[in-house]
């Protein structure tokens, strides 16, 4: 991925920080990467994943304007867990619990301008046979607010700062 794409926005940086943290905390996971939207069975049939695998997705981002001209994003995130084999359900729950525990009240994923994770939940999605192998998919979902998206109009380089400051001799009578 080019440097331009990596620096394209805080939401992508946030997702990459979560992936880095999960890789560090769960070294037995063989494949950990990003996912666009929800993970489904059709994707599992077409993608070559080495289980156990985790795919991190931003499922929704609700943007709220802030007085500074910036935005704050209420992110709805999902870490999709893919496990295989006889013990796939047990493995799936173990990984889901580990990820959910990582979503503690002090978890900022190495970033700043971020709220604590909230509304953490685990949901089993499916356990089925695909291409003659048993596969389980579950998801850990949570919400987290990402602040200071965009430019602050009141910073030194801001466009409005000089327009908001007036001198006494500039005010007409």
Task: Enumerate the language-model features and the residues they cover.
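A short, hydrophobic beta-strand-centered structural micro-motif
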Residues: 48-61
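Charged, amphipathic alpha-helical segments and their flanking helix caps
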Residues: 1-36, 59-173
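Short N-terminal edge-element motif at the start of the domain
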Residues: 43-46
């Amino acid at each position: 991925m080019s440097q331009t794409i990596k620096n394209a926005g805080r939401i992508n940086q946030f997702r990459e920080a979560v992936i880095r943290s999960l890789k560090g905390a769960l070294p037995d996971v063989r494949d950990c990467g990003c996912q666009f939207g929800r993970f489904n069975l059709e994707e599992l049939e077409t993608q070559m994943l080495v289980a156990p695998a985790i795919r991190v997705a931003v499922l929704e981002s609700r943007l709220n304007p802030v007085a500074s001209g910036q935005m704050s994003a209420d992110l709805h995130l999902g870490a999709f867990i893919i496990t295989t084999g006889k013990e796939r359900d047990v493995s799936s729950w173990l990984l889901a619990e580990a990820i959910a525990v990582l979503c503690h009240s002090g978890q900022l994923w190495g970033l700043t301008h971020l709220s604590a994770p909230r509304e953490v939940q685990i949901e089993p999605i499916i356990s089925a046979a695909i291409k003659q192998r048993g596969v389980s998919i579950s998801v850990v979902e949570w919400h987290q607010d990402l602040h200071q998206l965009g430019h602050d109009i009141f910073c030194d380089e801001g466009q409005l700062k000089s327009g908001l400051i007036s001198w006494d001799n500039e005010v007409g009578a």
